[in-house]
Amino acid sequence: MTMSRNGKTNKAAYSQRFTRCSVAVAATRSASVVAAAFDFYICIIISTLLSLIVSLASQLLF
């Protein structure tokens, strides 16, 4: 009886640990996706600003 009960307890503890780990991994993945999207957005803004500056400079020089 105690062996069966202990086995159930261990299984429940493992299940809880696995669930917590899965939530942590999912949160990390979503955070990294958000960070990658933010980096991409910043890169687009910077490249747009640089092309605008080059365009304005070329109009002023020529």
UniProtKB/Swiss-Prot annotation:
Query: Which domain of life does this protein belong to?
Result: Eukaryota
Q: Where are the transmembrane segments?
A: 33-53
Its GO biological process annotations read: cellular detoxification; detoxification of cadmium ion; detoxification of copper ion
Please give the GO cellular component terms listed in this UniProt entry.
Answer: cytoplasm; extracellular region; nucleus; plant-type cell wall; plasma membrane
For this chain, one GO molecular function annotation is:
metal ion sequestering activity
Which UniProt key words apply to this protein? Cell membrane, Cell wall, Membrane, Metal-binding, Nucleus, Secreted, Stress response, Transmembrane, Transmembrane helix
What family name appears in the similarity comment?
Answer: Belongs to the CYSTM1 family.
Subunit (UniProt):
Heterodimers. Binds weakly to CYSTM7 and WIH1/CYSTM13.
This protein is called what? Protein CYSTEINE-RICH TRANSMEMBRANE MODULE 2
Q: Which gene is annotated as encoding this protein in its UniProt record?
A: CYSTM2
